[in-house]
Amino acid sequence: MTVLIQGAGIAGLALAREFTKAGIDWLLVERASEIRPIGTGITLASNALTALSSTLDLDRLFRRGMPLAGINVYAHDGSMLMSMPSSLGGSSRGGLALQRHELHAALLEGLDESRIRVGVSIVQILDGLDHERVTLSDGTVHDCSLVVGADGIRSSVRRYVWPEATLRHSGETCWRLVVPHRLEDAELAGEVWGHGKRLGFIQISPREMYVYATLKVRREEPEDEEGFVTPQRLAAHYADFDGIGASIARLIPSATTLVHNDLEELAGASWCRGRVVLIGDAAHAMTPNLGQGAAMALEDAFLLARLWCLAPRAETLILFQQQREARIEFIRKQSWIVGRLGQWESPWSVWLRNTLVRLVPNASRRRLHQRLFTGVGEMAAQ
């Protein structure tokens, strides 16, 4: 029997690579008519790269993007709030920033294309004694030893595993764009915290910079008129920024790509049912404030493949969640807190936030970095 994966995003492709390496038969279906990554830039910290190194040549992957040493966080007046590395102090590599399509291309490279079907999705899952009988939208029926929902935050497989799941709106909306620019220090990303808004920037190629811009919104329903904003109108929201924030805001009108979405998260208790399991955003979508969403998907794929190879049975999926949920929940909560801090608006609250952030001891920051960057790949190597 085969393993069926739905979703040709980062999680699904990474898992297909892991199963290929392990010699396990798999079939991947993608409901879109083509494999086309949605988004602009992406960052991979050292824990993400360790998980990827199982099936990818990292030297080749680094040639697709730009090395990332860390991120500096600034106040809206341009003064420094804090600095955060992209790896543990002893890591031989830092992080990596690149276009999303470059990461997808790397994950697709070498995969058996005959095992990937686009324009196809799961329409029915029926439990068997030792398998799941899956009907696809093309009419074919497959008896599967394992079904994996890697189909993102709007997962349809999740309706089978966890029908009561609901997304929680973060109170922020976000625009992601690419501008033609090279930073003076291209290995350092930056984020500027203002009054209810943030502006981030990362070099993703020698001549392109990824920019993300968030605004606090007072609604719970996603995707309303806030999405219909031109780069020129978006830049005007950051007119009160000084220093490096002002420099980045002036680049926004030159955007060659502009993608908008609200920031949402998914927290709950049910990732598996029978021989069906969710991974990545389908299981635990989180706000992107720590840049760990893709890393969590890659860690999921790394661990699930290893556990399944050792014990290909339904109970393994329960073990998978047990081994992952504490780490996922910690990072989800930390990311949510960062987003909330960025939403503070009044002059008094912004002053208090900035003061408190500057007062955080370096030892506390190092402990946080240790927990962030010690993923399943590092644990397996120890």
UniProtKB/Swiss-Prot annotation:
EC number(s) from the headed UniProt entry: 1.14.13.182
Biological process terms in GO annotation: quorum sensing
InterPro entries: FAD-bd, FAD/NAD-bd_sf, MOase
Keywords attached to this entry: Monooxygenase, NAD, Oxidoreductase, Quorum sensing
Induction and repression of expression: By LasR.
Recorded catalytic activity of this chain's protein: 2-heptyl-4(1H)-quinolone + NADH + O2 + H(+) = 2-heptyl-3-hydroxy-4(1H)-quinolone + NAD(+) + H2O
Listed GO MF terms: 2-heptyl-3-hydroxy-4(1H)-quinolone synthase activity; FAD binding
Protein name: 2-heptyl-3-hydroxy-4(1H)-quinolone synthase
Source organism: Pseudomonas aeruginosa (strain UCBPP-PA14)
Gene field: pqsH
